[in-house]
Amino acid sequence: MKGILSEIGRLNHIAIAVPNIQKASSIWENALGAKISLAQSLPEHGVKVVFIESPNTKVELLEPLNKQSPINKFLERNPNGGMHHMCYEVSNLENATKKQQCQ
C-alpha cells in the first residue's frame, strides 16, 4: 500500500492562531501589501477568521471567539500566537483518511 503522500495535493492554506486578528491583519497588509478578506465569525468553530491571499496559497488567521474555543487553549500555551495547522488538498478524502489511519 502506498503511503499518505500519494494522496496529498497542493497546500491549500496555513492557519496561524493570533490573539488579535485586526492587529495581525494590519501587519500583513501594511508590511507585505497582502490582500486581506473580510473577517468572518464562525461560532460553530469558536473562531473569527480572515484569509490572506497569495499567488500560490492562503494564510488563515484565527482568533478565538470565547474562552471555550480550541484556539483560546492554543493561545494559552502560545500567548503570541503561532502556526496552528496546515491544510493540504486531497483527491479522495475517504482514501486519504483510511491511509492515514493505517499509519
Segments from the language model and where they lie:
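N-terminal mitochondrial targeting presequence
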Residues: 1-4
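Core segments of cupin and vicinal oxygen chelate
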Residues: 6-9, 16-58, 95-96, 102-103
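Intrinsically disordered, low-complexity peptide-like regions
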Residues: 10-11, 83
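Residues embedded in well-ordered beta-strands within globular domains across many folds
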Residues: 12-15, 87
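Helix-adjacent hinge/juxtasegments
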Residues: 58-84
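Mid-chain, well-packed structural core segment of small domains
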Residues: 75, 79-103
